[in-house]
Amino acid sequence: MAYSEEDFLQLSGLQHFRFCRRRWALIHIEHQWAENYRTIDGAILHENAHDTAFQERRGDRFITRGVSVYSAELGVSGQCDVLEYHRGAAGIPLSGKEGLWQPYPVEYKRGRPREDTVDTLQLCAQAMCLESMLCCDIPEGALYYGEIRRRERVSFTPELRAEVRELLVEMHELYRRGYTPKVKPTKSCNACSLKELCLPKLMKSRAVSAYLRAAMEESP
């Protein structure tokens, strides 16, 4: 199945969806947004990474930024923060460049590495889009974390690719229905920029601050 362009979802929404389905729906279906220091800090970090005019050659590495990607099969479109091309026999030809070059997407994140797949899903989806666009295989990429100023290598395993596909199918279905799901609040809600928009709708008879305190006490 191939999605039409008007049905494409934002690729960056994968991270929101994996973190909290309700948060994703509030942003992408209800078009609600609120800033906190985390979102502002993250926006600043991405500002330089999305400089589409930037190109640089460092030895056997060619670096570009803000590269648009899409996949009709997945029904998403978005941008790679940084797309590097590493010279190698398994790569692809690039116009005006000698040899073969392996695409290597790099995504910028503000914090530290996570134990779940919230961050890696978005990067993997970028790679899957690039594979479709460039007719090549991309086995890995990297996440750069601003807090530790270091890259973490990410392998695009069959399991990670399957999770990307499964979540996108669910996202398309919710978007088609225009449905904002309810979720069980947790201590993670305390750091969410949308908590004052989200929680009052979930807890009509209870103060948000009181609910958050209870959720934090109940969570391990």
Please provide the spans of the model-predicted regions.
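Cysteine-cluster motifs in flexible loop/terminal segments that predominantly coordinate metals
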Residues: 20, 179-220
